[in-house]
A protein has these predicted regions:
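Secondary-structure junction motif
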Residues: 2-3, 17-38, 102-110
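Thr-Gly-centered strand-to-loop micro-motif
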Residues: 4, 21-22, 44, 67-68
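Beta-alpha-beta core module
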Residues: 5-6, 52-99
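Alpha-helical segments flanking ligand/cofactor-binding loops in enzyme cores
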Residues: 11, 55-56, 107
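Short beta-strand-to-loop elements that line the ligand-binding cleft
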Residues: 41-53
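Extended ligand-binding regions for polar small-molecule ligands
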Residues: 91, 95-118
Length: 118
């Protein structure tokens, strides 16, 4: 029923089977925070470790999931739906050796992901 929408409210997933990441996943605390903030207690049907596996189970119509916007989901038979009441961002950091020469490919990658070289 959700797939006909381009946007939904977070409340719309509360009564659906919810597929989420395991508690040791980097994204799980953010998902839990979003649900807690919205006072939503979904029925967790599965806790999985890999993005592709979460997407695969959603693609087999076994539940819904909150996932990061990643290209891997474009390869799966699922529809990404924007959740209207989520306005969260996650910051990622990249570590590298400071006092070394940076290759052209490295600098282009930094520019592509829009971050600063320190």
């Amino acid at each position: 029923p959700l797939a006909k929408n381009d946007e939904i409210d977070l409340k719309q997933i509360e009564d659906l089977p919810f597929i989420t990441f395991t508690k040791n996943s980097g994204i799980r605390p953010m998902i839990d925070h979003l649900l807690e903030k919205a006072k939503i207690h979904p029925h967790i049907s599965m806790e999985l470790e890999e993005d592709e596996v979460v997407g695969g189970f959603v693609g087999h119509d076994l539940g819904v999931a909150i996932v990061p916007d990643m290209a891997v989901y474009d390869l799966l038979p699922i529809k990404k739906i924007k959740i209207k009441d989520i306005d969260e961002k996650q910051t990622f950091y990249m570590a590298y050796l400071k006092n070394t020469q940076k290759s052209k490919a490295f600098l282009e990658f930094i520019e592509h992901v829009n971050c600063d070289v320190l």
